[in-house]
Curated annotation (Swiss-Prot):
Residues 16-98, 136-217 form the Doublecortin domain. The gene is Dcdc2c. It is found in: Cell projection, Cilium, Flagellum; Cytoplasm. Residues 241-251 have a biased composition (Basic and acidic residues). It comes from Mus musculus (Mouse). GO terms for biological process: intracellular signal transduction. One of its GO terms (cellular component) is sperm flagellum. Residues 235-260 are annotated as: Disordered. This is Doublecortin domain-containing protein 2C.
Length: 347
């Protein structure tokens, strides 16, 4: 029969549990570590396992007591349930490690429920709304252009105090001739202040030209309640009748249709000139004679001409004289009968 070898002696030392802190960290709560002689043969093996469990720069190389900082040199110096400080090659940093208490997680604040913004679609005049409204929303037509849709313009609160800035903001989106110089209501009332502006209302922007009376409220972009409000506008109906009456008058007087009158190939009739004299004639029928004599000549007497005064008249204007012939002169003169000598110049 064979003989049995001697039994190997087994270390029956119980395992030890220690709490390890990190050197110089006042917020590190500490970590429990359990080791036995079977797994940890010496002090170097313990330091290697602590390096894996406690994150220390450059690894755990020393253990200190938490109160006075005495170094631990072997496994026998460790006590069950003891507290120690793991450090690298630096010196012990004195802190109150024993009274480090784990912090309770802070309570999460309940976030307020974000409610969606509810936009109000009620269209009422601005004087009924809250004064803290930051802006005005208006719709603007272009003067004389009914078929162009109205432009929505947002006017901030700080711009409402200056009327010129309001017109300038409208002019950035609406482009009448000459820029926006005037703002009218749809029935032609001129606005000169932003206090009269109403939210979600319709206006007409114009330049230097006059307001063109067109039924803007009949546009398809205008709500039905606004169309009903302007449906019986007396001002527009009166102007429409006035324009129609002016168009009918020339058609009744002229037998030629208006298209032929406007045509360049149509020969228009000459107008008869007035036969009345523009200048009235005087008492004697002379248009150049003054009706009343001048003041200087009213008391002057007219001087009559003297009959004995001889006036030299040109030969061509002198009255013609009858010249008698020589025979008649000889018969009538007594000298010729008695044999008087007649000069040779008369022969």
């Amino acid at each position: 029969m064979g003989t049995r070898g001697p039994y190997a002696l087994v270390d029956t030392t119980p395992a030890k549990t220690i709490l390890v802190y990190r050197n110089g960290d006042q917020f590190y709560v500490g970590r429990k570590f359990v080791f036995s002689r079977r797994r940890v043969a010496n002090f170097e093996a313990l330091l290697e396992q602590l390096t894996e469990q406690v994150e220390v720069p450059f690894g755990v190389r020393r253990l200190y007591t938490p109160t006075r900082g005495h170094p631990v040199l072997g496994l026998d110096a460790l006590q069950t349930g003891g507290k120690y400080v793991a450090a690298g090659r630096e010196r012990f940093k004195k802190l109150d490690y024993i009274h480090i208490v784990p912090r309770k997680p802070s309570k999460m604040r309940k976030l307020k429920e974000i409610k969606p913004v509810v936009h109000c679609d009620i269209k009422v005049p601005s004087r009924w709304q809250i004064q803290s409204r930051t802006s005005r929303y208006i719709n603007v037509f272009t003067n004389g252009r009914l078929f162009i849709p109205p432009i929505k313009v947002i006017i901030p609160k700080f711009s409402l105090s200056d009327w010129n800035s309001v017109l300038a903001m409208i002019g950035e989106k609406v482009f009448p001739l000459g820029g926006v110089r005037k703002l009218f209501t749809m029935d032609g009332h001129l606005l000169d202040d932003s206090k009269n502006l109403q939210d979600n209302y319709f206006y007409v922007a114009a330049g230097l030209e006059t307001f063109k009376s067109i039924p803007y409220w009949k546009s398809s972009w205008v709500p039905s309640e606004v169309q009903q409000r302007f449906g019986g506008n007396d001002k527009y109906t009166q102007t429409k009748k006035r324009v129609e009456s002016k168009v009918k008058e020339p058609l009744q007087n002229d037998s030629v249709p208006p298209r032929s009158q406007d045509s360049v190939y149509y020969a228009k009739e000459k107008k008869q000139m007035d036969t009345e004299l523009l200048v009235q004639s005087g008492a004697e029928g002379d248009v150049y004679k003054a009706q009343t004599p001048a003041k200087e000549a009213q008391e002057a007497l007219e001087v009559k001409e003297d009959p004995e005064v001889k006036v030299e008249v040109p030969v061509d204007q002198a009255p013609a004289e009858i010249v008698k012939e020589i025979d008649e002169i000889g018969d009538s003169s007594p000298g010729l009968k008695s044999g008087m000598h007649i000069p040779a110049s008369f022969m």
